[in-house]
Amino acid sequence: MLINENADNYDRETSQYIVAYLDLLGVADRIGRDEGYQKIAMNKLHNLYTFSMKLASEIAIEEYRDIQFKIFSDNIVIAKKLSEQSDKRLLDIKCLLNCVSHFQCLSVGDGVGWLVRGGITVGELFLDEIMVWGKALLKAYNLECRVAIYPRIVIDREIIPEIITNKELSEYVLQDFDNEYFLNYLCIQHFGGQILMNGFTIMQDELNGKFTESIYQKLCWHMNYVNKELDKKNEKRDKKYRLKLK
């Protein structure tokens, strides 16, 4: 006899979603610090989540209203159900990529100053107010913890052809030195040099000069990515802002 089968129809099913699984790096270490620091870190995290969700809900495009969030401590799932119509499907993908880009911009900027790693894929998912389940979640999680390595959000190779053949979507994708594709979140940001530079200062101040080799690699990757994107944008107001290691 199945649990609660008299009251439940057992008719929930997975659907096609585009899914991002994100990990905010260093949160476990922040939890282990003194009470005053913990309080600031906890409130930063809470406001990062609530502001991102509020921003997604307020964007005056219907497709953004269906973006779903599932949060557990320093991990977040952002998902969007995909339409079966090809033109709407591409718009769904764009909405998700844009939403995740906003989240990452907020996280690395001077309002928070934390690095993000993650994975994005398309596949079967079930998501409601109680739980999240499906192969897409597992794939996105594996991309984050086994492939991403650096503070980047890796995009599943299986969906790359669909993205890079669309002019608008292709702006959200870059290929890295190891041939992995990742989210070019700064494609949505303009005149953000000072915000990014100040965010990088926060990251380094938080570490107080105590870098492990792994942390150093992550900081260098982030610094190089941001500086390259600022160089490409070549915006006059941002020419004096570049990230530097202390």
Stretches found by the model and what they are:
Residues 109-113, 117-118, 122, 139-159:
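Catalytic/regulatory signature loops of cyclic-dinucleotide turnover enzymes
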Residues 2-9, 149-246:
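Intrinsically disordered, glycine/charged-rich C-terminal tails and inter-domain linkers
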Residues 30-33, 81, 128-138, 164-166:
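A short acidic (Asp/Glu
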Residues 27, 125, 160:
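Short, solvent-exposed loop/turn segments at secondary-structure junctions
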